[in-house]
Swiss-Prot record:
Its EC number is 6.3.1.2, 2.3.1.225. The modification Phosphoserine is found at residue 343. This is Glutamine synthetase. The gene is Glul. In the adult liver, expression is restricted to a small population of hepatocytes which form only a small rim of one to three hepatocytes around the central veins. Expressed in lung microvascular endothelial cells. It comes from Rattus norvegicus (Rat).
C-alpha cells in the first residue's frame, strides 16, 4: 500500500525544533471549508498574546482563486473566526481557529453554510436542539487502495470487522487512537469511536452539541483526522461509497432531540417530528450530501443497513429505515431519534439546519423558506 513521502521524513528531527521555546508568541492555525464544500484548508499566523476568547482573534484573508472560491481578478476572501480549540499538533498555548468565509463584498461564500445555519439555530434556541453525529470514514493509501487490503484482491467478507479486535480484523487502529486523543486535547466533544462493518472503515461520534456547535465541532474533528492521517502517510476519505459492490457505505447518522423530546412523554414530540420529516423527504435528501443527493444515491440502496433513497421509512431499532427510534427511547417514551440518511461527506450545517427547519419551524415543500431579517 502506498504512503506519502512526507510520512517517511524523520519525525525525531522535527520534534527537536518543536521543543524550542516560542516565547510569548502564539501560533493560530486558521481553518476553513473550501469551494468544494468538502475540502478543508488552513494557514497559520502569529499573535503576540494568548487569546482568551474567539472574539479576540483578528479577521484574516486568503486567495480564493486558489481554493475554488473566487476569480483571480477579485480573489481576496475574508476569514472570520467563529470557534477556537487547543492545538493538539503544536500544543498549548497554540490554537486551532475555525472560520466562516466571506467574499470581497462581505457576503457569505457559497460554501459558507454556517452563516445560514446560525440564523436558523438562533430562531429555535429556546427549544435547546441537541445533535450528535456519527462520522464514518475509510482509511486509504495514497494510491486510493483501502488501508490493509490485499494489493491484488479483497479481504474476507464482512462480518468479523465491526468493533473487531485483532490484526486480521482492525485495520489502522493507531490512527483512530491518535485522532481520539488529539480531539480530547483540543476540546472537541468526541464521545466515542469504533471499527465499522467494512475493513479499514471506522467511525467517531461527536456530541451532544447544542445548535450551531454541532457543525463547528464536527468540521474541526474532520480537520484533526486529516492532519493525523497526514502524519501517518495515509488518507481518510468521507466518500459515502468508496468501494462498490457488497461492502457497506459510509454515512453520518444524525441524532436529534429538543428539550421537549428529552422530557417525560417526549416520544409524542418525536413522533410528530418524524411525521413532518416523512412529508419532506426529497428536500432532506438534497441537503444531506454536497451533490444534492447524487453521492447518497450510491449508498442509500436499501441494502447494507441503509434505506432506499426514494422512500421514507421509520421504525424502532430498524437500521434499514430512514429514521430509527432507539429501542430504549421507545421503552422510556422520551429521548431522541436518529436520521440515518446523511452521507459521510455531508455538511453538518446543512443537515442540522434542514432538520430544524422541518421539525421545529414547521416548513413544508421542497425549498427552504426565506425569512426576513
Amino acid at each position: 500500500m502506498a504512503t506519502s513521502a512526507s510520512s517517511h521524513l524523520n519525525k525525531g528531527i522535527k520534534q527537536m525544533y518543536m521543543n524550542l521555546p516560542q516565547g510569548e508568541k502564539i501560533q493560530l492555525m486558521y481553518i476553513w471549508v473550501d469551494g468544494t464544500g468538502e475540502g478543508l484548508r488552513c494557514k497559520t499566523r502569529t499573535l503576540d498574546c494568548d487569546p482568551k476568547c474567539v472574539e479576540e482573534l483578528p479577521e484574516w484573508n486568503f486567495d480564493g482563486s486558489s481554493t475554488f472560491q473566487s476569480e483571480g481578478s477579485n480573489s481576496d476572501m475574508y476569514l472570520h473566526p467563529v470557534a477556537m480549540f487547543r492545538d493538539p499538533f503544536r500544543r498549548d498555548p497554540n490554537k486551532l481557529v475555525f472560520c466562516e468565509v466571506f467574499k470581497y463584498n462581505r457576503k457569505p461564500a457559497e460554501t459558507n453554510l454556517r452563516h445560514s445555519c446560525k440564523r436558523i439555530m438562533d430562531m429555535v434556541s429556546s427549544q435547546h436542539p441537541w445533535f450528535g453525529m456519527e462520522q464514518e470514514y475509510t482509511l486509504m493509501g495514497t494510491d486510493g487502495h483501502p488501508f490493509g487490503w490485499p494489493s491484488n484482491g479483497f479481504p474476507g467478507p464482512q462480518g468479523p470487522y465491526y468493533c473487531g479486535v485483532g490484526a486480521d480484523k482492525a485495520y489502522g487502529r493507531d490512527i483512530v487512537e491518535a485522532h481520539y486523543r488529539a480531539c480530547l486535547y483540543a476540546g472537541i466533544k468526541i464521545t466515542g469511536t469504533n471499527a465499522e462493518v467494512m475493513p479499514a472503515q471506522w467511525e467517531f461520534q461527536i456530541g451532544p452539541c447544542e445548535g450551531i456547535r454541532m457543525g463547528d465541532h464536527l468540521w474541526v474533528a474532520r480537520f484533526i483526522l486529516h492532519r493525523v492521517c497526514e502524519d501517518f502517510g495515509v488518507i481518510a476519505t468521507f466518500d459515502p461509497k468508496p468501494i462498490p459492490g457488497n461492502w457497506n457505505g459510509a454515512g453520518c447518522h444524525t441524532n436529534f432531540s429538543t428539550k421537549a423530546m428529552r422530557e417525560e412523554n417526549g416520544l409524542r414530540c418525536i413522533e410528530e417530528a418524524i411525521d413532518k420529516l416523512s412529508k419532506r423527504h426529497q428536500y432532506h435528501i438534497r441537503a444531506y450530501d454536497p451533490k444534492g443527493g447524487l453521492d447518497n444515491a450510491r449508498r442509500l440502496t436499501g441494502f447494507h443497513e441503509t434505506s432506499n433513497i426514494n422512500d421514507f421509512s421509520a421504525g424502532v431499532a430498524n437500521r434499514s429505515a430512514s429514521i430509527r427510534i432507539p429501542r430504549i427511547v421507545g421503552q422510556e417514551k422520551k429521548g431522541y431519534f436518529e436520521d440515518r440518511r446523511p452521507s459521510a461527506n455531508c455538511d453538518p450545517y446543512a443537515v442540522t439546519e434542514a432538520i430544524v427547519r422541518t421539525c421545529l419551524l414547521n416548513e413544508t415543500g421542497d425549498e427552504p423558506f426565506q425569512y426576513k431579517n
